[in-house]
Amino acid sequence: MARFWVCVAGAGFFLAFLVLHSRFCGSPVLRNFTFAVSWRTEKILYRLDVGWPKHPEYFTGTTFCVAVDSLNGLVYIGQRGDNIPKILVFTEDGYFLRAWNYTVDTPHGIFAASTLYEQSVWITDVGSGFFGHTVKKYSSFGDLVQVLGTPGKKGTSLNPLQFDNPAELYVEDTGDIYIVDGDGGLNNRLIKLSQDFMILWLHGENGTGPAKFNIPHSVTLDSAGRVWVADRGNKRIQVFDKDTGEWLGAWNNCFTEEGPSSVRFTPDGKYLIVAQLNLSRLSVVAAPPVGSIGECSVISTIQLADQVLPHLLEVDRKTGAVYVAEIGAKQVQKYVPLNSYVPSFGS
């Protein structure tokens, strides 16, 4: 064993001699020396847009949510704090447009649902004040259009509809709405509403079995007509048929360290972007084909700095850019798609 370490030390000294000799004496020895290194390629799918936004000084609170109006090139951001505007509006290029604070208590989730005829944004409000425990629709300039739930009063009722800490929603182009209600509140449920706000189906029981939830935190749809729910407390993603509400399966194997806090598909439907709050991590997961959802397979990850805490994210349907609301860093960052490969050490 002693002879082994002597050999290792000797090799190290010899290599150091070659480096110094080449550096100070211009020796060609090192230039002709071949290193045998094992390489693998790691797929890099996104890069940080360091220039977004142009005016980060408008982030004056804790940023909890972000939405993208791809049709009109707008980015909405919900932030919390005292005596600050709760909703900020930027362009996709990062220029600040306006802010508003009307009838918003404590924003948690936000979704832009604009059409050719209407610019609108939906907000889930988890505040305990007069405007809390509601899901609300606004115009782009902050005019209140619709209120779902009983403002200022939490509850479990379906008629009239009541919420307790509604986490997020997703609005289809048809106008149908999917709401995950229960960010640590009385409810743990997924509700589908029609465009005239009638309940079409729901799953609403706390637990660990199929179609049961423990903090349903985010919801999205894919092009195959499936509803994907980040079941954060159970450390899994559950999947349902959007028309019938039938449970189609769950992904349990990818999130054993930390449950998913946010889910969104890329515009081409190839990937599901998943945020994990306390790990400060974004995972790019291969989307399954039509049929069985199979097993979760992580293609790539974006590891953020400690305590950045990505809460909710959104994907631009046109450009594929990913916007991440970070409650630890108190900012929103933008990641741009990039199809490239870089070498990294590995076996």
Curated annotation (Swiss-Prot):
One of its GO terms (molecular function) is ubiquitin protein ligase activity. It is found in: Secreted. NHL repeats lie at residues 47-93, 150-196, 200-243, 294-338. One of its GO terms (biological process) is proteasome-mediated ubiquitin-dependent protein catabolic process. The keyword Glycoprotein applies. Glycans are attached at N32, N101, N206, N278. GO terms for cellular component: azurophil granule lumen; extracellular region. It comes from the Eukaryota. Keywords: Glycoprotein, Repeat, Secreted, Signal. Residues 1-25 form the signal peptide. Pfam families: NHL (PF01436). This is NHL repeat-containing protein 3. The lineage of its organism: Eukaryota, Metazoa, Chordata, Craniata, Vertebrata. The gene is NHLRC3.
